[in-house]
Every structure is written in structure tokens, then in C-alpha cells.
Amino acid sequence: MDGLVAQCSARLLQQEKEIKSLTAEIDRLKNCGHLEDSPSLDQLREENLKLKYRLNILQRSLQAEKRRRPTKNMININSRLQDVFGCAIKAAYPDLDNPPLVVTPSQQPKFGDYQCNSAMGISQMLKAKEQKVNPRGIAENITKHLPNNEYIDRVEIAGPGFINVHLRKDFVSEQLTNLLVNGIQLPALGENKKVIVDFSSPNIAKEMHVGHLRSTIIGESMSRLFEFAGYDVLRLNHVGDWGTQFGMLIAHLQDQFPDYLTVSPPIGDLQAFYKESKKRFDTEEEFKKRAYQCVVSLQSKDPDFIKAWNLICDVSRAEFNKIYDALDITLIERGESFYQDRMKDIVKEFEDKGYVQVDDGRKIVFVPGCSIPLTIVKSDGGFTYDTSDLAAIKQRLFEEKANKIIYVVDNGQAVHFQTIFAAAQMIGWYDPKVTQVTHVGFGVVLGEDKKKFKTRSGETVRLVDLLGEGLKRSMDKLKEKERDKVLTEEELTAAQTSIAYGCIKYADLSHNRLNDYIFSFDKMLDDRGNTAAYLLYAFTRIRSIARLANVDEEMLQKAARETKIVLDHEKEWKLGRCILRFPEILQKMLDDLFLHTLCDYIYELATTFTEFYDSCYCVEKDRQTGKVLKVNMWRMLLCEAVAAVMAKGFDILGIKPVQRM
């Protein structure tokens, strides 16, 4: 097979060279000006047309050959069916520009496995050209032009022109075997492409609170998704580590720990330390003046003040890392301070191109289509968030050479980022058709009273307290089910952590990120419905089926290579198709950046598995002795495929399942 592809490729290259040579010769003859009726020119034209025709056939053959080559990757069936129907529509209606191509999974078994719903749209296009054609007739014409393929068993036309597609059972069985033998692999969709994901971004000297939870969880999951798709992902933590607040913190540090340069100050509670310094800043005029002097010294890079700044950042960083480690978050810190030296050049570039206006001492930039201007220099000469965000986006585009930049920041910052992106386009830093820069917004976390999530005293909920409460609640739930009497201490702790952090993450990710969501430990720890608790329990049950039947990993691998997966029962067929939709789900998320789609899919997979398991015996036992009489190996393989897909889905969501719960 490889030899044939290589041979086709070589012929293709040779014919492309011949076409270039002939085209050059035709151009030369045209330029002579007196060879309009030259037989030489006519002969060359004819030869060129023949070569182009043969080249077109070769290109199509090569593409088809590559499609037929065995691959270790999971196939996106929806995408393959779109290719097939795209060819059919082009052949049936060659004169239509960009006809609609709509292929979706069927919602009910009676409508087949997939549906092509293009006929109605094509009917409208033909009507606009004053050609009246019934959509059903269009559907019939499309089906007549379907090319030979390995995916479709048969098609049916239903209603006004829906084309119901039934997949070949052998094809589905082969794809499931491929998944089991080679693991879950995607084609290298992001090969040689770089994605930057900017998320979490807490402020130094302030504790992380529930408001940071969504950005951190969504950003981590999004990073994992792009990494799995083969992208080079840079995860950035744009912490607030610069600004006037450091003046008051350093001044307070000098007063509280005068020997801080030689003895590391024991700042136990940085939040309390911040509040004390803020109180002094607001009430003591002398302290306020000294705080401003400290800012000037810090900005001029005085070594003693840089050391004080580093000490404060280190204390904060240690607290942040406790939360990141608990939630298995990976980030590279690159705060506002990183961009300070670039800001003067940013201002100069906007000035040189005539975009800067002065308003009450401020330097502002109006951006077309945006109602609020950017302030790039304050009236006191200082820079702003606008300046640092412009410096950041330029660095990411020109130095990091990112193909995609994703900012995971709450919906309240939507206008700010729209303006930053528009300014970057206006000044010529990037073309949105080439580089994708996206604000991934999200709603706020609400309490059960449907107001912003607060403590009983009305304060913002500290993230460390929230995680601690989650651990306590999950242990209570496990003990309520008497799992402490079955699991070892190590297994119990692993289950506690898996449930606590998994439920917190899943409760966030399972909602459409644009919406606010209600935080409720009771709901997220419920082991019924679309919750992490239910899915984690389902996963451990699936994993236990082989174990209880005394089927080990080696036996499963041998069976995957040698046993054909039979899909004769309707529940086997439904489960097999559901498993193979995984690449489609991932592609949709890569396109629209909505992660709840994956949560919905994993839940659908788990419930489809339950239907299968209730109807199809995987293991047959003696009812009296419990002795295993028969193991239906192809069904065990279906169990294994479900577990493999769920495990990868959990990994993308940042959830760690356990083998026993």
C-alpha cells in the first residue's frame, strides 16, 4: 500500500512539473504576438488540458488511497461522511457555489445513524436561480452520486428530503478494534501550531477566591484538550504582580520587619498583612507618602526594593501553588512585571502611527467599533492594564509566534478584550483570518440563594476553604456508604480526593460557561444524574467487570487483536456508535471552545453503557454458586472501550478516577 502511494506521489510531482513547463511555454508563445493561429500553440494547449485532467484524476486517487490506508488514529466519522456527501453534492450540482453541507448524528434509531440535511438548503439556492426542484428530488440526485466508500451500508430518503445514513457494521467493529489495539489517538490536528492559554491570573498579596475557580478550571481543561489534539500549548498565568499596591506593602514590610534584607520575614497571613497595609495607607498620610516613594524606587529597580517585592511575591506564590498542586493545574507564571520594559515602546508605536490623543493629561486610543477608548498612559505618567495587555498580546504574537491565543477571563472583561484585540488589529499586529485571538468568557459562581457566592458573613469565599469543605463532604459521603469498611486507608483517601476535586471541577465544566451557575455541594456530590460522583462510580463499576470475571489486561489485549466485536444486539450497536463519536465531540470543542459538550457526551456514554449492560450479558454465572460459566469476550471489549474513552474524557476535564471507590 505504501509503495502504491509513493508511486502515485512521484507521478503527481512529475506531472505538476510538466504542467508548469507547458504553461511557461504557452505564455512564451502568447507573448510572441504573431502566433495566434499557430498549430504549435494549439497542440500545447491540448496537451496541457489532457495533463490537467490526468493530474486531477491522480490527485483524487491519491486522496482516496490515503483515506483507505490503515490508521492508528480514531476516525471522525461525521467528518468522513461530510467528505462523501460533499463529493456527491459537487457531482450532482457542479454549478452551485458553496452548497450547504449538513451531516449530523441521528437523534432516533429509526432515522439511521447519521442524517444529511442538505437538500432543503440546495432547493432554496436553486429557487434563487429560478430553478424549481423538489427537495426530495434533490436528495435522490445526491444519493445517486454518492462515491464508493467504506462507511455507508445504505441510505434512505425520508420526509421532505432528509437522507438517513446507516453505517456498515464491519466498519464500526473495525474502528472499535483499532481503538482497543492502538489506544485513543487523534490525527495530529495541531501539528506545528502553537496555542497560548491565559488563565487563572490571581493578584499577588491577595488570596485566591471562588472567583478564580472558573478561570483556573476552564483554562486547565482547555489546555489539556489542545495538547491532546497535538498543539504546542503554552499555559500562562498573568498574575497581578506590579503596581501601586506594592508601594504600601513594601513600606509596611520595612516597618514590621526592618531586617528583611538579611532575615526572611515570617509573613504568616499575607491577606491580613495586605489589609493592615491598606488600612495604614488610607489613614496615615506620612505612610501614604512613603508608599508612593517605595513605588518609585521599585520601578527604578532599586535592589533593596526588588528584594522586598520578591519576598512578597514568593509568599503569595507558595499559597497559589498549594491550590494548583491540589487541583493538578500546570501554569507558567508571567505576570504584569514581565511586560514593564516593553510598555514605553508600545506607547511610542501607537504615537508614531498617529493613534494617540491627549485627554486631561491621559494618553488615550480610540479604536473603530469600540465605544470606550484605551488609556495607555495615566495623567500621572503611569501605565495601565490596557498598556500591559497590549504589551502582552504583542509579545505573544511576535516573540512566541502563537497561532491561537485564548484568554480565559470572566464575561465582565468582554468589552476590554474586544477593544484590546481590535487595537492590535488596527495597528497591524495580526490578521484575524490568519491568527485566532479569542476571549473565552464565563459567568459568575452563585450561592444557592442565586446571589454571588459569599460566606455567611458576606465575604468572598476563599478557594482554600472551599476545597477543604469539599474534602470533608466527600469523606462524609464515603463513610455514609460504609466505603471505609471496604477500602484500605490509601484507597479511601484517593477516593475522597477524586470525588471532592472531581465534583468541583465537573460542576463548573458541565455548565455552559457563558452562564452563571449555582454552587451546591449537595447537588455535585449526588451520585445520580449528570454529576462527577455518578460518572466516577460508573467508571469504577465498568473497570470492575473484567476484574470480577478474572480477565486481566493481557487477556483483554489478546482478545482485542483476535476477537471480532459483534454488534448484533441493538444495545451493542447503540453503544458502539456512541463510543466512536468521541473524535466528533473533541473537534466540536476545538472549534467552539465549549467544554460542557464533553461532559454531556461522557454522561450519555455512561447511560448508554448502563442500557447495554442491563440487556446484554458480559459474564454468565451460576446463580447458586456464583461461579463464572461463560465470558462473552466481545462484550468485555465493549466495556473496555467505554472505560478507555471515559478515562481520556476525565483526563481532558482534569478529573482523576480511581480503580476502587
Swiss-Prot record:
One of its GO terms (molecular function) is ATP binding. InterPro entries: aa-tRNA-synth_I_CS, Arg-tRNA-ligase, Arg-tRNA-synth_N, Arg-tRNA-synth_N_sf, ArgRS_core, DALR_anticod-bd, Rossmann-like_a/b/a_fold, tRNAsynth_Ia_anticodon-bd. It is found in: Cytoplasm; Cytoplasm, Cytosol. It catalyses: tRNA(Arg) + L-arginine + ATP = L-arginyl-tRNA(Arg) + AMP + diphosphate. One of its GO terms (cellular component) is aminoacyl-tRNA synthetase multienzyme complex. A motif ('HIGH' region) lies at residues 202-213. The keyword ATP-binding applies. Keywords: Acetylation, Aminoacyl-tRNA synthetase, ATP-binding, Cytoplasm, Ligase, Nucleotide-binding, Protein biosynthesis. L-arginine binds at residues 201-203, 212, 385, 389, 413. Belongs to the class-I aminoacyl-tRNA synthetase family. Forms part of a macromolecular complex that catalyzes the attachment of specific amino acids to cognate tRNAs during protein synthesis. Modulates the secretion of AIMP1 and may be involved in generation of the inflammatory cytokine EMAP2 from AIMP1. The alpha-helical N-terminus (residues 1-72) mediates interaction with AIMP1 and thereby contributes to the assembly of the multisynthetase complex. This is Arginine--tRNA ligase, cytoplasmic. It comes from Cricetulus griseus (Chinese hamster).
